[in-house]
Curated annotation (Swiss-Prot):
Name of the protein: UPF0690 protein C1orf52 homolog
The UniProt record lists the keyword Phosphoprotein: yes
Bias (Acidic residues): 152-165
Modified residues (Phosphoserine): S162
Compositionally biased tracts (Low complexity): 32-44
A family per Pfam: DUF4660
Amino acid sequence: MSDEEKSETRNFFMGYDDLSDSSSDSESRSGPEATASSAPAEPQQSRKRAAEPLPRPDELFRSVSKPAFLYNPLNKAIDWDSRAVRAPEEPPKEFKVWKSSAVPPPQSYVTEENKKKAPAGMDMAIKWSNVYEDNGDDAPQAHRGPAHFLPEEEEEEQQPDSDDDSSSKLSKSAKKRRVETFQQKEKRKRDIGQATSDKNFVEEEKRILRQCLD
């Protein structure tokens, strides 16, 4: 830079300093005067505000300024639809066939002809009822009569006569009669014991009398 440019820059900053000094002096001079004049007015205003009642909510909200850009002047309501930001619509996806190594399906289907079955006939080597349990003609039939555990000849020999049957019935009925309850058994025992005790008492008295006579 040349000497002239340096001097111009210095003069510029020096002039700015002079302006700032003059403004600060004016503020310093006006400061105490303004405070002195506003000092008596402030307590009066504060007293007036304290004496006044608080405004109602309706009045308070009416006095509050509302931004005009949020309202529609015709309907006096917020037009949210116009202000909503929507995402850009995606283009419709195109269907693409997957690449695979599978064999494509045939264009036409052909049904295979039915294979020839074996000629109809009975296989004598297999009993179908035993294998598949389908109760065919060759399946074993269930015995529906009374069970016979012995041959017919032995059963006839072991059958008792009619007299034996009657005697066995009588013996069974007698056994049923002889069945006693626990209380009956105890009573019978007490009776037997009392009889024996009386007999012993009599025999003891006889023995004592014999001794006295001797």
